[in-house]
């Protein structure tokens, strides 16, 4: 009897098939990386067996989505279903684009279309399918909703709106919400493509190059940050959401 009991405790090592990995940044910990990707510490550890939490090694790749075979008795071959994160990282650079594509699945209810971005309002009753080229400004304008409403109904979308997923649904209405009459977006004048939110009377444009930031642009053309942001209304306060290869306004 004892040999059989001992045999029942023999476990296979965990096997991980990683489908998406990212390099750690300087100062990253298991907690910060897990939080950025919306996964639990336990899932992160299971996807990265042998990881030495809490500290991570900068520039070493860590798995954040994949399939994990659990520790199982030697007599079974059952595996866990695929684990997928529920969020995208909030870190952005000037090379970010308006939409990204992730091979992940998340839904909020059986009545909602699928797939949806994570964290949508549970009482959402109207959805928008994100397509390439969409951004928060264009979606909000189309449905006549405010930035505060959009962020409240889609809390996992970050402040820079750089983590919209193409081909996923976002929430654009909840019961009782007050919205303004949506208006067709005017066709922008000037060179293309442009950052969203450029004023209609813009006369001078600048193409964002690698290494550009608001300070270097403003210094080069002799304008203030207040002027720059008044002409480029979708650029946030810390200027972390300008897009490489897009035009911004530098004069009216």
From Swiss-Prot:
InterPro entries to which the protein is assigned, alphabetical: LysM1-like, LysM_dom, LysM_dom_sf
Subcellular location: Secreted; Secreted, Cell wall
Entry annotated with the keyword Repressor: no
Domain LysM, first and last residues per copy: 20-64, 126-172, 204-250
Molecular functions per Gene Ontology: chitin binding
Origin: domain of life: Eukaryota
Entry annotated with the keyword Flavoprotein: no
Induction (free text): Expression is induced during growth on keratin powder but not on human nail fragments.
Segments for region (Disordered): 71-98
Pfam families per UniProt: LysM (PF01476)
Principal location: secreted
Comp. bias (Low complexity): 72-98
GO CC aspect terms: extracellular region
Keywords: Cell wall, Chitin-binding, Repeat, Secreted, Signal, Virulence
Comment block on domains: The LysM (lysin motif) domains are small globular domains involved in binding chitin in eukaryotes. LysM1 contains 3 LysM domains.
Biological function: Secreted effector that binds two substrates, chitin and N-linked oligosaccharides associated with human skin glycoproteins. Could provide the pathogen with three important functions including shielding host cell wall chitin from the human immune system, shielding the pathogen's glycoproteins from host degradation and immune surveillance, and helping facilitate pathogen adhesion to human skin.
Protein family: Belongs to the secreted LysM effector family.
Protein name: Secreted LysM effector LysM1
Gene that encodes the chain: LysM1
